[in-house]
Curated annotation (Swiss-Prot):
Disruption phenotype: RNAi-mediated knockdown at the L1 larval stage results in the disorganization of myosin thick filaments in adult body wall muscles characterized by the formation of abnormal myosin heavy chain myo-3 aggregates and V-shaped crossing of A-bands. In addition, body wall muscle cells appear shorter and broader. Homohexamer; ATP hydrolysis initiates a cycle between an open spiral and a closed ring conformation which is probably involved in pulling tubulin dimers out from microtubules. Interacts with mei-2, which may serve as a targeting subunit. Interacts with mel-26, which targets mei-1 for ubiquitin mediated proteolysis. Interacts with phosphatase pph-4.1. The lineage of its organism: Eukaryota, Metazoa, Ecdysozoa, Nematoda, Chromadorea. Changing residue 92 to A: Abolishes phosphorylation by mbk-2. Abolishes interaction with mel-26. Prevents mei-1 degradation during the transition from meiosis to mitosis. Changing residue 128 to C: In ct46sb22; gain of function. It comes from Caenorhabditis elegans. The gene is mei-1. This is Meiotic spindle formation protein mei-1. It is found in: Cytoplasm, Cytoskeleton, Spindle pole; Chromosome; Cytoplasm. Changing residue 360 to S: In ct46sb23; gain of function.
Amino acid sequence: MNGDVQSVIRGYLERAQVAKTMSDAGRWNEAGDLLRQLMTDVKSCKISASNRDEHDARNTFLRALEANLKLVQQNVRDEDDLHEAMTRQSGSPEPPADPDVWSKPSPPLPSSSKFGATKKGVGAAGPRPREISKSTSSMSTNPADVKPANPTQGILPQNSAGDSFDASAYDAYIVQAVRGTMATNTENTMSLDDIIGMHDVKQVLHEAVTLPLLVPEFFQGLRSPWKAMVLAGPPGTGKTLIARAIASESSSTFFTVSSTDLSSKWRGDSEKIVRLLFELARFYAPSIIFIDEIDTLGGQRGNSGEHEASRRVKSEFLVQMDGSQNKFDSRRVFVLAATNIPWELDEALRRRFEKRIFIPLPDIDARKKLIEKSMEGTPKSDEINYDDLAARTEGFSGADVVSLCRTAAINVLRRYDTKSLRGGELTAAMESLKAELVRNIDFEAALQAVSPSAGPDTMLKCKEWCDSFGAM
């Protein structure tokens, strides 16, 4: 069996282990969902028609998954039957059948599973429930505890092929949550040329995202493109900007996600959000999933203070990361993440990021270009010495440099007393200030007001981590 198939099967085995853990914990519905999805993925694997070993391995694995799914389904049925029996035992006795005394009871509703399949035998035995008045049913339920309705139609746009995503298996608020993170390639107009510096990062992203779409025949076998990358560095160095730029240049659908986007108060729904995120990324492929502050989502597992819900989300995320790296899946999904504290990442998650790149603070040339670019479109004096400003902003991040330029531009206003002006006088004064030039004195005042936001300790720790675990 070749290495590609072995690698894929290892990923499937990890997902099967997650399903077993869910089943052992009594989370049978979630285990059933994962097993069904896993069986679908295994069946869709494209393997050589002439390789009997690969066919036998896949069939054996499918039989094992099917056996586990039957056990899970039996547990779900047993739990439902027990719940129904307890409900009948604690409910009211069978009403008289005299139609003059009692109204005819309504027929029992079939109990449906999560996927719309009707349970066999449910409602065939036991007393039929009495008709419940509207007033009684409305009093028995707290409206605050009821999930919103499921009107998912029209939330998601069509993909490039004109197809619509079937989101009927998800609650509407879950679909809305993921839709809020998505920007189609027509909504993003940035370019890598807008990003100053970071030449090594641009090169790797160009090789991993743009070129495979232009010349896919080259990126085969060992040259298969990278699927996941994490950018580690101090805050304000342009990690988010470069993610948006590469998504625009490659005409990819862009998902920007934080830990709060993946959170829900409903048990099990956070995992569904993660699953839907990757399903939509594959549906709208080519796609880029950008996860900011990945350390808040993928921190070290096993900590004493870690909540069970957090572990479940991490497990689902790891499973989906492996799913998006299926070598037999031609739908291009690239996972790009950023962090300021990479040493907090879980080891299993760190392994899934094939490229781990250090993003340093901008050097003197990058700072000069950034000051010049920031001042474009703003009236300024020719006396401004950009070389001197670049030299005096050592230790500044890209965001700090932009903040310095904005402060200098605002300082034009502070050179004049506008506190006593009102109405037309204030409007006229502000209109004249639009043409006022930004001068050296404004930058001098800005340098006194703006300090570097990134501490040297953070910079050093990021560099040490990338020296130990980086992969360029």
